[in-house]
Amino acid sequence: MVEIDPFEMAVQQLERAAQFMDISEEALEWLKRPMRIVEVSVPVEMDDGSVKVFTGFRVQHNWARGPTKGGIRWHPAETLSTVKALATWMTWKVAVVDLPYGGGKGGIIVDPKKLSEREQERLARSYIRAVYDVIGPWTDIPAPDVYTNPKIMAWMMDEYETIMRRKGPAFGVITGKPPGVGGIVARMDATARGAAFTIREAAKALGWDDLKGKTIAIQGYGNAGYYLHKIMSEEFGMKVVAVSDSKGGIYNPDGLPPADEVLKWKKEHGSVKDMPGTQNITNEELLELEVDILAPSAIEGVITKENADNVKAKIVAEVANGPVTPEADEILHEKGILQIPDFLCNAGGVTVSYFEWVQNINGFYWTVEETRKRLDDKMTKAFWDVFNTHKEKNIHMRDAAYVVAVSRVYEAMKHRGWVKK
């Protein structure tokens, strides 16, 4: 099977969306290209005294709506094409929830599991020394991503402050930091909570009174999967009947044990499998369960043309990135299943990162309750913007999300005089 280039895929998705909107060819050509691509050498002194030089990237896709925003990935198979694609997709994600940002993304080709903690810190600081002049609170705001975390963000922020010789904190340069250095507590469950709000609104769109007693199956039990289980069962009264991880899943039609118990079992046994009071199922079986809502929250490409016709859920909430293939999209649409596309469904994380940045810039911090209320408002409006476009144009929810997002970026470009039409 020939693997498609990630950036080529991003361009093709943009071209598909353009069919459903009035956008000029010159604007479309501009949106197909990142506005800035930076490739840097990142030298690191290793613990044995030797020096290794790693390759790093920072891509800023479009800043028509504001500073670019996006995570920094550390991965041995990182490529410039992947970073360009992710920066492009980030532009649409921040636009669909109407954040005043453009899309950015960074990466380093490295296997962080082979580095000591001190080597990781030196890598983080060296990367910032290489890109400090293209990032900043009003320019480009990084965040955690694959194999990076709040601790690494704090090192990066500290290095940026040191280089810029600021007389005070530069908290706003990076989000996803620990609470003690400008981070916010509400970030932990933000992706799952944002997804929960879109699920609630999707239920309303289908005419359901509420979610109490409705069933949901969640594929994936990382941060997003665990918190989604916890929020949907404890706050929305849903019956979580199945969850899974990479080794398999568990099922109970009457509802699983509480999320904290499932997480405890997973930590002690390395998987959710074999938990008392449940029956083991495969990840494939989970996707085809008779449930009201299916939430693929693990990896991409799990719902394909081979199994899409067997999906029985009425709502598919794409908490993971790209869990449904384009061919499967068509099948789910024909079956009348309401999809919440990934870059809308999982935008809660970047939305709360935006809230962190706003609070850093203003030096005034909200309560967790206030942060969650603002997240609810953002995700609710975004869902209905997309759903109404889906109905008005009679197009797929994913296409509708692209139309909403691309239109907002296009409008900003016209206002700036970058394009005439």
From Swiss-Prot:
User: Misc remark for this entry?
Assistant: Uses both NAD and NADP.
The active site is formed by K105
Output one GO BP term.
glutamate catabolic process
Chief location of this protein? cytoplasm
- Molecular function terms, GO-annotated: glutamate dehydrogenase (NAD+) activity; glutamate dehydrogenase (NADP+) activity
Q: Which family does it belong to?
A: Belongs to the Glu/Leu/Phe/Val dehydrogenases family.
Which E.C. number(s) belong to this protein?
Answer: 1.4.1.3
What is this enzyme's class at the first EC digit? oxidoreductase
PANTHER family on file: GLUTAMATE DEHYDROGENASE, GLUTAMATE DEHYDROGENASE 1, MITOCHONDRIAL
Matching entries from InterPro entries are given as:
Aminoacid_DH-like_N_sf, GLPV_dehydrogenases, Glu/Leu/Phe/Val/Trp_DH, Glu/Leu/Phe/Val/Trp_DH_C, Glu/Leu/Phe/Val/Trp_DH_dimer, Glu/Leu/Phe/Val_DH_AS, Glu_DH, NAD(P)-bd_dom_sf
The record's listing under Pfam families reads: ELFV_dehydrog, ELFV_dehydrog_N
Task: Name the source's superkingdom.
Answer: Archaea
Oligomeric and partner information: Homohexamer.
The name this protein goes by in its record: Glutamate dehydrogenase
SUPFAM superfamilies the UniProt entry points to: Aminoacid dehydrogenase-like, N-terminal domain, NAD(P)-binding Rossmann-fold domains
Name a single GO cellular component.
Answer: cytoplasm
